[in-house]
Amino acid sequence: MRITVMTAGEQIITLDVDSQETVENVKALLEVESNVPIQQQQLLYNGNEMGNSDKLSALGVKDDDLLMMMVSNASSGSATSAAGNDLGMNPDGSALNPAAFQQHIRGDSNLMGQLFQNDPELAQVISGSDLNKLQDVLRARHRQRSVLQRQKEEELALLYADPFDVEAQRKIEAAIRQKGIDENWEAALEHNPEGFARVIMLYVDMEVNGVPLKAFVDSGAQSTIISKSCAERCGLLRLMDQRYKGIAHGVGQTEILGRIHVAPIKIGNNFYPCSFVVLDSPNMEFLFGLDMLRKHQCTIDLKENVMTVGGGEVSVPFLQEKDIPSRFLDEERVPNDASSSGATVPSGFTEKKNNTVANPTSQQPKRQNTSEGPEFEAKIAKLVELGFSRDSVIQALKLFEGNEEQAAGFLFGG
């Protein structure tokens, strides 16, 4: 018959055994599968401990039944084996040789990095010089682990007391699922530890209208963005065209105040023309988006950690973490509310122009002028010659305020 054994560590083991098999022989099989010595195994069936000499059939174990294996503490054996090892631990969780333990952990930069991320208090103590405090923290961590382990064992024991209970089955399923998540996390720590590190975004040094700035390079943003305060500091706010108001969509959304059609930017030693979408975003100064990356043939070279411009005529390095203002790094650490902050907008940013004018009464005469006069009629005639009806041509020209090229593109696009 087939039985399933679940360990206290939530490992699932399936065994094919005879119904007349003794519990001791089952434990021998489990020792091979789990590496837990027979002496430390404690098998439970329906919440009751199984004796080594008992047979499975005598205990009522049937095909597809579930057993639970607990592991008893072998503190004396652990203490003996740890005595010859300076890096060993005492039964209370403290280090046998705290100085050697501290030195060993300090020498592993990857482990220290994980500690600073997962247990900053312990990492700070290891970095310090107070060995007594280190021992106290290690004992506290050991007590916490012991309490959690005991709670888990008690909960599992209650679950397996009635394994056919629906709620118990649901909790067992959740425990198995969590075990898979934990194993995936442990595998990532071993094989992909950089996945837990904070990624430093791409910044380069630029000058906008003669003002030095740290530009955030984001190929996921449709347009190049400048904040209202930054545009004012660069002397460009007076050039903002408010007819280009709209909504910026990304992770969240924010209002587009207008557009600055062209201004000089300096990358390396060269000057380039650049247009900007202006946002009222205090958390983001200047974002170099996909429109200008394409226009100036920029290449993001992550192997060399540089951005090349103009097909390679200029190459500027991406800034190291120490060169990036701390306020930008803080924004990366703490996610902002998408509805109130432009910091969540840039990556994946697209702009949606708002054709609704703020003051219809004052703007209406301008719209009427676009549909009057010989110039407008000449545009209609050109587009009608392309095969479009006069009514659709007039509607398209009015939609784009007399812009013949945009109207033609709209008509051809259906």
UniProtKB/Swiss-Prot annotation:
InterPro entries per record: DDI1_N (IPR033882), Peptidase_A2_cat (IPR001995), Peptidase_aspartic_DDI1-type (IPR019103), Peptidase_aspartic_dom_sf (IPR021109), UBA (IPR015940), UBA-like_sf (IPR009060), Ubiquitin-like_dom (IPR000626), Ubiquitin-like_domsf (IPR029071)
Cystine connections: none
Ubiquitin-like domain: residues covered: 1-76
EC category name: hydrolase
Presence of keyword Protease: yes
Enzyme Commission code: 3.4.23.-
Highest taxon, organism lineage: Eukaryota
Pfam families, per database record: Asp_protease, UBA, ubiquitin
Compartments, as annotated in UniProt: Cytoplasm, Cytosol
Boundaries of every Peptidase A2 domain copy: 213-292
Domain UBA: 374-414
Hydrolase in keyword set: yes
GO-annotated biological processes: proteolysis
Gene3D superfamilies membership: Acid Proteases, DNA helicase RuvA subunit, C-terminal domain, Phosphatidylinositol 3-kinase Catalytic Subunit, Chain A, domain 1
Sequence intervals crossing the membrane: none
GO terms assigned for molecular function: aspartic-type endopeptidase activity; polyubiquitin modification-dependent protein binding
One GO cellular component term: cytosol
Keywords: Aspartyl protease, Cytoplasm, Hydrolase, Protease, Ubl conjugation pathway
Active site: D218
Known partners and oligomeric status: Homodimer.
Biological function: Receptor of ubiquitinated protein targeted to ubiquitin/proteasome-mediated proteolysis (UPP). Relatively weak affinity for both 'Lys-48'- and 'Lys-63'-linked ubiquitin chains with a slight preference for 'Lys-48-'linked chains of three or more ubiquitin units.
UniProt-listed PANTHER family: ASPARTYL PROTEASE DDI-RELATED (PTHR12917), AT13091P (PTHR12917:SF1)
The protein's name: Protein DNA-DAMAGE INDUCIBLE 1
Organism of provenance: Arabidopsis thaliana
Annotated gene: DDI1
